[in-house]
Amino acid sequence: MGGPRAWTLLCLGLLLPGGGAAWSVPGARFSGRRNWCSYVVTRTVSCHVQNGTYLQRVLQNCPWPMGCPGNSYRTVVRPLYKVTYKTVTAREWRCCPGHSGVTCEEGSPGLLEPTWTDSGMRRMAVRPTALSGCLNCSKVSELTERLKALEAKVAVLSVTEQTVPSVPATPEDSALLWGSPAARGSPGDGSLQDRLDSWGLPGPTGPKGGTDSQSPVRIRGPPGPQGPPGRPGQTGAAGTPGKMGPPGPPGPPGPPGPPAPVGPPYGQVSLHGDPLLSNTFTEMGSHWPQGPTGPPGPPGPPGPMGPPGLPGPMGAPGSPGHMGIPGPSGPKGTSGHPGEKGERGLPGEPGPQGLMGVPGEPGPKGDPGEKSHWGEGLHQLREALKILAERVLILETMIGLYEPDLGSGAGPDGTGTPSLLRGKRGGHPTNYPIITPRRRSERS
């Protein structure tokens, strides 16, 4: 639930008393006044909503005096208001099931719910002008004052109804015992309690009425809809602090510090070895007695490599070593350029004549072949291709893809392109000749 409906429920929750569904007046004297129950009622109210959008035509500026053909439109917001209707949910106080009367003290044995008449429901309708701004929460104080004024009127009307002499009610007047729903507002805090003090203690319960066949039978209706959600609870106490986490990793090294101050000019540190491990200083003033020799110091770091020495004399030749393993074969080299063509050699001497061979045996006679088999097949294939080319040319001429000039001889034999097109456009049927391959006897 969000939007205006949520603001409506929030305003009603601030105005109406909180707590449970049943309302009770404190004090032992008013112990019978706790028979009020809240019911959720849905109403339709009117609101003024700003809605004034319309399309505006924008003309384009043209450099020439004539008008431009193109126009554009844009959406413009104009401060207009129109009346709309909203459905709001409110809370009303009525007698709980099983109780009746003006103050909801009279109990009924069957736990029956009150019967609301149509006239009472019409009087409880909310006027659209009463809710200014569609239940705006900025006027809470004004709504509170109006609610107190309505409670005072309800108390006055309740007192006047008690002073009216009671008459034996007929079955048609049974709805009047419940009071007017519009005249009964939500219970207040102090003003209603002060007026209840002046009424006095309730009278004794009257005798139970007899059963009558004409009396209306009241049946308990279904339960009402679920009420609005309650107010949010208070903020809980702060929890106990957690345990200390493990130490974090070491941070990066810091930047180098400033240089140390320069020492006195007479405090010369020995240049032999590390200055921090040396205790030899130049004495000034009086001479102190020489002490015993101390233990040798730790070895110093190796010095830098010196310059290479002169080459020594050549040594004696060594013994020949063993033959090594042959290495792998190298990659194949590139082919060289072809050499020049040599001179033609002298012709050789003719060889001796060979002996005449023995004649071979005659071979078997072959089968008689078919006469002009391959030639006839090739000729038929050539004729079929020629016929196919002529038919394709005829189709192209009929469709209009290829229109040869008159008298050029490009068209097929026996076909006229203008007559074909004329017959096609005029709608007259034209008998086209069907070309069939000529026989061999006809060609000869």
Swiss-Prot record:
Residues 221-371 form the Collagen-like domain. Residues 33-106 form the EMI domain. Residues 161-374, 404-444 are annotated as: Disordered. Homo- or heteromers. Disulfide bonds join C37-C96, C62-C68, C95-C104. Residues 222-231, 244-264, 292-311 have a biased composition (Pro residues). InterPro entries: Collagen, Collagen/C1q_domain, EMI_domain. This is EMI domain-containing protein 1. Residues 232-243 have a biased composition (Low complexity). Keywords: Collagen, Disulfide bond, Extracellular matrix, Glycoprotein, Secreted, Signal. O-fucosylated at Thr-42 within the EMI domain by FUT10/POFUT3 and FUT11/POFUT4. It is found in: Secreted, Extracellular space, Extracellular matrix. Glycans are attached at T42, N51, N136. Transmembrane segments: none annotated. Residues 1-22 form the signal peptide.
